[in-house]
């Protein structure tokens, strides 16, 4: 899989799930906590500020680069004896069984499994095979994504500003950096 330097925010609930499954120690060194969120709306007087301390939480969420998250997940899966990861691989057939499926890969290898997850992209062979519905909505926006260094260290503060053209967000990252996501009309 290809993982790039874009950052994602993990909710507090997602982090709790990683703790429950024993994966958090692998993720923690790569994460930056979101301890405060400031939300504003251009052209309106209202604004909101959320603080993890107000909710008795160590953080409202965590920010991690996709590359670090991907590598961490791969290492975690490699450490699980009951997970057999095939990557890259291309499915050619799926045969339903009473309890699971038999998968045939393009190279002819066959695998039987009780669980098959349709997480193979926007043109999912698995989704198409099982005729799973797709819901799409074009927001007619593009996102400008960058990692920026600001004059002041973000220190756990995230910012989101809603504008007529789309939202603008800054997420705190490690080493005093921030992830910028700026949605602009297409």
Feature map (PLM): residue ranges:
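A short, flexible beta-alpha/helix-coil linker loop
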Residues: 1, 53-57, 151-153, 185-186
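Glycine-rich FAD cofactor-binding loop and adjacent beta-loop-alpha segment at the N-terminus
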Residues: 1-35
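Short glycine-enriched, charge-decorated loop/helix-capping segments at active-site entrances
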Residues: 2-9, 55-58, 132-133
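Short clusters of hydrophobic/aromatic residues that line enzyme substrate/ligand-binding pockets
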Residues: 8-10, 27, 48-50, 126, ...
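Conserved N-terminal helical subregion
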Residues: 30-129, 136-142
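Conserved FAD-binding catalytic core of PHBH/FMO-like flavoproteins
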Residues: 116-186
């Amino acid at each position: 899989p290809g993982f790039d330097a874009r950052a994602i925010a993990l909710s507090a609930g997602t982090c709790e799930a990683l703790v429950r499954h024993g994966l958090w120690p692998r993720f923690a060194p790569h994460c930056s906590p979101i301890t405060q969120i400031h939300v504003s709306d251009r052209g309106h007087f209202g604004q909101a500020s959320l603080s993890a301390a107000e909710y008795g939480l160590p953080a409202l969420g965590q920010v991690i680069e996709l590359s670090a998250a991907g590598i961490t997940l791969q290492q975690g899966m490699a450490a699980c004896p009951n997970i057999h990861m095939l990557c890259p691989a291309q499915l050619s057939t799926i045969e339903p069984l009473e309890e699971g499926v038999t998968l045939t890969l393009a190279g002819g290898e066959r695998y039987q499994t009780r669980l098959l997850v349709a997480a193979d992209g926007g043109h999912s062979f698995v989704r198409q095979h099982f005729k799973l519905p797709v819901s799409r909505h074009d927001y007619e926006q593009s996102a400008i994504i960058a990692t920026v260094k600001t004059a002041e260290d973000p220190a756990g503060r995230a910012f989101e500003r809603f504008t007529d053209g789309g939202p603008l967000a800054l997420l705190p990252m490690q080493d005093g950096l921030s992830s910028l996501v700026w949605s602009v009309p297409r």
